[in-house]
A protein has these predicted regions:
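Histidine-acidic metal/acid-base catalytic patches
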Residues: 2-3, 8-107
Length: 107
């Protein structure tokens, strides 16, 4: 199972629900952040997921809580598409910044 932080948050899944499943089922985690408020408009949901994910620490998702319920050796991938930021600073700078934020948040 892949756990995507954005979809986990939007689905209102509880951390306790992760504990009810065998840890060996989990292989991969998508790290990102999102606003606390969950949009009700489908177009906004799609836009935010594809073009406006936030760096770790900028939003409301409990990444540390989610990770605490998953295997320690789970593969973690940073999935933070953000069209405005990439237009402003470029893809490489955005990727580097995403990695910096993730490292700082997870320390």
């Amino acid at each position: 199972i892949v756990v995507d932080a954005l979809h986990f948050h939007r689905s209102r899944v509880k951390l306790e629900e992760l504990e009810s499943l065998p840890k060996e089922w989990f292989r991969f985690m998508h790290l990102c952040y999102a606003f606390q408020e969950i949009p009700t408009d489908l177009d906004v949901l799609v836009h935010d997921g594809r073009e406006e994910r936030l760096y770790p620490g900028e939003g409301a998702i409990d990444l540390k809580g989610i990770l605490s319920k998953l295997p320690e050796n789970i593969v973690r991938g940073i999935e933070i598409p953000h069209s405005v930021r990439t237009a402003e600073i470029g893809f490489e700078a955005h990727a580097r910044r995403a990695l910096e934020y993730a490292k700082k948040y997870l320390e």
